[in-house]
């Protein structure tokens, strides 16, 4: 299966709708599927269907050559199984480690590409990181930092829930993979706090789960130190540790998400910070290379989209464009760190990330 045109996009929320629009603009024939699709006119076909039914999905997937799941992570396993059964390409945005492991198992016998974790982090940040590691004869550290924040925060938390509260709670509480001094290990989330500056703005970063995808497995024995941290405004981590651990909200994750979203609803004026830094040796000389960007809202298809929405949707759309063009593998597991950054930036959607 080389070039393909027909793509189903499951879940037409903000990110799914934007991803479908970007794929349509890149020349794909898009079929949007949602349990309760919008009635507003769209430039591609849309239909209502039960996205939780593997049987229903298998029926729909007979009409397409690839599927992008923008559904909540707990629904992705069934979608991946249906795609595997139909022999089509599969892409998703999941940060969930058990879901990804199930998809990795399916990829061993797939006829199409199985590409989980194609969003911002994991996803784009891993593509950037891999390009930096490749610049060294020996890499002693790769530090990946990403944060989606309100541009003009109020209050002590300095935050707004522009992303899934379920996803944020999980990444604040689940253990984090790292490589430390050549050893692959797990550490607690919301630790290892550091000060970071982007465009002169004072920020903090701390460990959160899921952002590395498969990178620890790939770079064990290659990179001495590898970790991922979330960027926030100063003071955020200490308050979240108080909320989850001293007040024991870690035992009531769903309620924690409700409380936080009610207090800090989404904003339209957001900013995504990406700070990727790597150190290592070239011809015996120690060097440091960085990729640092600040992404703000952007208009696509006549609609203004938040930074977190377009960076997430744009990353997966660019990867799908690359698979279509034959510049990526056509079957089996696709890891984000396998994706050449220069070719990513050369795609119609990837150009948005050049900054």
Predicted features and spans:
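Hydrophobic/small residue at the entry helix of a nucleotide-binding pocket
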Residues: 15
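NAD(P)-binding Rossmann-fold cofactor-contacting core
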Residues: 30-42
């Amino acid at each position: 299966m080389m070039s393909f045109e027909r793509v189903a996009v499951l879940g037409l929320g903000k990110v799914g709708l934007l991803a479908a629009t970007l794929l349509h603009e890149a020349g794909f024939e898009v079929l949007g599927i949602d349990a309760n699709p919008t009635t507003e006119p769209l430039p591609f076909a849309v239909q209502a269907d039960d996205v939780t039914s593997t049987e229903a999905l298998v029926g729909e997937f007979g009409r397409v050559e690839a599927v992008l799941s923008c559904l909540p992570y707990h629904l992705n396993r069934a979608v991946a199984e249906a795609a595997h059964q139909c022999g089509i390409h599969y892409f998703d945005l999941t940060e969930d480690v058990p879901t990804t492991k199930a998809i990795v198992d399916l990829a061993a016998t797939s006829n199409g590409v199985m590409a989980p974790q194609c969003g911002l982090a994991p996803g784009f940040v891993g593509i950037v990181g891999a390009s930096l590691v490749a610049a060294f004869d020996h890499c002693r550290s790769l530090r990946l930092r990403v944060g989606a924040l309100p541009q003009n925060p109020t209050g002590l938390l300095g935050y707004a829930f522009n992303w899934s509260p379920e996803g944020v709670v999980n990444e604040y509480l689940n253990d984090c993979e790292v490589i430390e001094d050549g050893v692959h290990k797990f550490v607690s989330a919301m630790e290892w706090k550091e000060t970071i500056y982007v465009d002169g703005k004072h920020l903090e970063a701390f460990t959160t789960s899921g952002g590395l995808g498969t990178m620890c497995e790939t770079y064990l024995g290659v990179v001495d130190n590898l970790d991922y941290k979330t960027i926030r405004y100063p003071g955020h981590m200490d308050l979240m540790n108080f909320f989850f651990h001293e007040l024991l909200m870690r035992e009531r994750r769903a309620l924690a998400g409700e409380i936080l979203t009610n207090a800090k609803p989404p904003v339209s004026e957001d900013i995504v910070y990406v700070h990727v830094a790597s150190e290592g040796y070239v011809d015996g000389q120690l060097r440091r290379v960085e990729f640092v960007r600040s992404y703000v809202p952007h208009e696509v298809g006549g609609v203004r989209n938040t930074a977190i929405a377009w960076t997430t949707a744009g990353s997966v759309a660019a990867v799908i464009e690359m698979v279509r063009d034959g510049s990526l593998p056509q079957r089996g597991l696709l890891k984000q760190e396998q994706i050449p950054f220069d070719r990513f930036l050369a795609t119609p959607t990837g150009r948005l990330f050049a900054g």
